[in-house]
Regions:
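Short, positively charged and aromatic/hydrophobic N-terminal segments
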Residues: 3, 13-14
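N-terminal active-site segment of His-dependent metallophosphoesterases
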Residues: 14-83, 167, 372-390
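Accessory, non-catalytic peripheral segments of nucleic-acid enzymes
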Residues: 16, 254-390
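Conserved beta-strand elements of the Class I
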Residues: 21, 144-146, 248
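Structural beta-sheet core signal
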Residues: 22, 67, 101, 173, ...
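His/Asp/Glu-rich metal-coordinating catalytic cores
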Residues: 35, 64, 75-229, 233-238, ...
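Glycine-rich, Lys/Arg-enriched anion-binding loops that position phosphate/diphosphate groups
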Residues: 213, 218, 224-227, 231-281, ...
Length: 390
């Protein structure tokens, strides 16, 4: 039975480990332009996985749900995505005693605002500074959640106003912002955070959103003294977001480090195959076979090819071959070919092709560094392919 948001007594002991579902950066309504022709299919896959969240909450018997910003990709989502969010949150409220949300830098509070039609029983933090905690009594005991809607114009340093309540139970801070030492974009309009600020909050868990890679508490402090966690993006928004994506299941109790587990969203993840040596391959089709054999079931390949080859790799052809097997594939070519036997043979020819090969080799050898060398080699390959030379 769902319990009242009001605490049933001034002091209520924790009855069991509290389980919280923590998500952020779903970006409903994103274009997924990086996925090219697969963009529409990708968008539908995200919506399908998002609709499954109530079942995830039910399966894990969570006591609360936290949404740490950027639920939407813009402050004015289209009606379909707004309706999807309303329905999912309505169903989540049938499973968990409470759902808490903060806006992010992509979906800030405007008028009418992206969260205007969210069910009233969900709590959206709309003040620009953290105030008193919103408290709910759960089957695991009292939960106190602190949050705010960051607005630099109103309060550039909202965490300076944070005050933890002196109350029994689990205390959680819900924050959308970028930790300064994270490998994160340097600009933007997100709240900037520091380890020191997070460590002084005195709460049992800090549910973070904005940074798109899963970062468990151990990445903030090995001893558990900073109980912060980025759940990462719900699903990869572009081809750079490789690896597992989803939501975090948190088990937390007062005065002990939280235990977190990343639950895959169910949207096909991007699998990075970095520096894949294809020097033993004899042609593009063999490269396709080698890559395909390394892709995990249900994943989409993002591969960087490397090695010294005896043929000029055609990354567009390799990518097309992979796209015939997977809904999406991205290929980056970093192979070396300029000092191969084939190119030496071409440079010995007494024709336009030979002249081009010799000129290209001279420019490659005169490059000032490896980056410039690679650029000049790839330019030579493209020029040779344009002349029908493989």
């Amino acid at each position: 039975m769902r319990e009242s948001l009001a605490l049933s007594a001034p002091t209520v002991m924790i009855r069991c480990m509290m389980r919280i579902l923590h998500l952020a950066d779903v970006h409903l309504g994103a274009s997924f332009a990086s996925f090219g022709p697969h963009a529409g299919e990708r968008s539908e896959a995200v919506l399908k996985a998002f609709r499954n969240l109530p079942e995830v909450a039910r399966e894990h018997e969570v006591h609360a749900v936290l949404v740490a910003g950027d639920l939407f990709d813009s402050p004015r989502p289209d009606e379909r995505n707004a309706a999807e969010a309303r329905e999912v949150i309505r169903q989540l409220l049938e499973v968990a005693p409470a759902v808490f949300l903060v806006p992010g830098n992509h979906d800030p509070l405007v008028i009418p605002g992206p969260y205007a039609d969210i069910p009233e029983t969900a709590h959206v933090f709309s003040a620009p500074v953290p105030g008193e905690a919103v408290s709910v009594d759960t089957e695991a005991g009292p939960l106190h959640v602190y949050g705010f809607a960051y607005d630099f114009a109103h309060e550039p340093d909202p965490l300076a106003r944070f005050r933890r309540a002196d109350a029994e139970g689990v205390h959680v801070a819900l924050v959308h912002g970028a930790v300064r030492d994270a490998p994160h974009w340097s600009g933007g309009d997100s709240l900037r955070l520091s380890h020191d600020e997070l460590s002084t909050l005195g709460v049992d868990y800090i549910a973070l959103g904005d940074y798109h890679r899963f970062r468990p508490p151990s990445e903030f402090a090995a001893d558990g003294s900073v109980p912060a966690c980025y759940c990462g993006s719900f699903a990869a928004l572009d081809h750079t977001e490789t690896g597992p994506r989803g939501v975090v299941l948190v088990e937390v109790s007062p005065d002990s480090p939280p235990v977190v587990r990343l639950l895959p969203s169910g949207v096909p993840p991007l699998q990075a195959l970095a520096d894949l040596d294809v020097s033993t391959c004899s042609d593009d089709l063999e490269v396709v076979e080698k890559v395909a054999g390394l892709v995990e079931v249900g994943s989409l390949p993002v591969v960087t090819l490397s090695g010294q080859t005896e043929f000029a790799v055609d990354p567009e052809r390799v990518e097309a071959g992979l796209a015939a097997r997977f809904p999406f594939a991205r290929v980056r070519d970093r192979t070396r070919h300029y000092d191969s036997d084939r190119l030496a043979e071409l440079s010995s020819r007494d024709d336009v092709v030979g002249h081009l090969a010799r000129l290209g080799l001279d420019r490659i050898r005169a490059a000032s560094d490896e980056v410039e060398e690679g650029l000049r080699e790839r330019a030579l390959r493209k020029a040779l392919r344009a002349m029908g030379v493989t």
